Amino acid sequence: MRKIVHVDMDAFYASVEQRDDPSLRGKPVVVAWRGARSVVCAASYEARTFGIRSAMPAVRAERLCPDAVFVPPDFARYKAVSRQVREIFHRHTDLVEPLSLDEAYLDVTEAKTGMQLATEIAQLIRTQIREETQLTASAGIAPNKFLAKIASDWRKPDGQFVIAPSRVDAFLLPLPVNRIPGVGKVMDGKLAALGIVTVSDLRLRPLEELQAHFGSFGQSLYRRARGIDERPVEPDQEVQSVSSEDTFSEDLALDALDPHIQRLAEKTWHATRRTERIGRTVVLKLKTSNFRILTRSYTPEQPPASLQGLVDIALGLTRRVELPPETRYRLVGVGLSGFSDPELQAAVQGELFGEVPQQ
């Protein structure tokens, strides 16, 4: 039986800012640029009490908490701390799969230290993070990645939770189905319309029914409802693409997609920074009301060097959609692919990761 730990830093960017600037401690801190198109990169726990969340438009965050302190992101500093944390991970196992600057999966089935109990390994890792970075982390311990990720949220902040193999069903079945990664607001509504509210409800549905309604995602739902996840922890997994997408509650015309494309471009921009990689190809994804999927892409000579550059390319790709004007769209996505190692493009990285996005 595998022993998987998911470690997630607590309000990472905001916590780094509060650590480095004592005047911010105890205050609602929002890591974001101000501006109509800006989105929240991170919110301190004080800010979260006002309903502020990551990826929320910054203007909405400002309305929710006018007294919030807005701090522009400093990704170079966050990356430096992330490297410290990853060094701690590697003391315990070489099987470390970073998901972003602030979270990773670890397979500690055969830990370097010889420690046998995954709970003790997770506790030691969290203690070392606290002592060496003055930051806190939460951890989930389980037999697979899916369960470990859910567990890491259970005792946030600064806690850990274990799902033992013998307790998987007792833990999983009562959960609302939206705790399954990938089940967002729209999917949650579709499942509820079928009478599926909890994981227990989901488990009662046959695979064929779920596939009929949700295609390949139906198979994923079927497996997750049974706590099945055989994906290995893949060390130093290279990011192939980064994207953000939205499914609408009502289908929209093409010319109504611009504000959504702008917001998704910013989410993708920030997500790219967290991966520490550079994407060159801009991809626009659309799904029509009759579920036809279209993608349009453009590869400039150099990667987009600013947020506005990414937005402009993504918006320009809508002009390459040659469908009747009455066509309606139920989903839009913006992505970056064609990633290169930043060390091979140091000059580009300096521009890409060092500049302040245009507002």
From Swiss-Prot:
Alphabetical keyword list: Cytoplasm, DNA damage, DNA repair, DNA replication, DNA-binding, DNA-directed DNA polymerase, Magnesium, Metal-binding, Mutator protein, Nucleotidyltransferase, Transferase
Organism expressing this protein natively: Xanthomonas campestris pv. campestris (strain ATCC 33913 / DSM 3586 / NCPPB 528 / LMG 568 / P 25)
Recorded catalytic activity of this chain's protein: DNA(n) + a 2'-deoxyribonucleoside 5'-triphosphate = DNA(n+1) + diphosphate
Enzyme nomenclature, EC number: 2.7.7.7
The protein's name in its UniProt record: DNA polymerase IV
Gene3D superfamilies, alphabetized: 3.30.70.270, 3.40.1170.60, 5' to 3' exonuclease, C-terminal subdomain (1.10.150.20), DNA polymerase, Y-family, little finger domain (3.30.1490.100)
Function comment: Poorly processive, error-prone DNA polymerase involved in untargeted mutagenesis. Copies undamaged DNA at stalled replication forks, which arise in vivo from mismatched or misaligned primer ends. These misaligned primers can be extended by PolIV. Exhibits no 3'-5' exonuclease (proofreading) activity. May be involved in translesional synthesis, in conjunction with the beta clamp from PolIII.
UniProt GO cellular component terms: cytoplasm
Compartment(s) of residence: Cytoplasm
CC cofactor: Mg(2+)
Pfam family membership, one: IMS_HHH_1
Superkingdom to which the source organism belongs: Bacteria
Active site (UniProt): E103
Subunit structure: Monomer.
Residues that bind Mg(2+): D8, D102
Cofactor: binding comment: Binds 2 magnesium ions per subunit.
Major subcellular site: cytoplasm
Site (Substrate discrimination): Y13
Residues annotated as domain UmuC: 4-184
GO molecular function per UniProt: damaged DNA binding; DNA-directed DNA polymerase activity; magnesium ion binding
GO BP annotation list: DNA-templated DNA replication; error-prone translesion synthesis; SOS response
Family statement: Belongs to the DNA polymerase type-Y family.
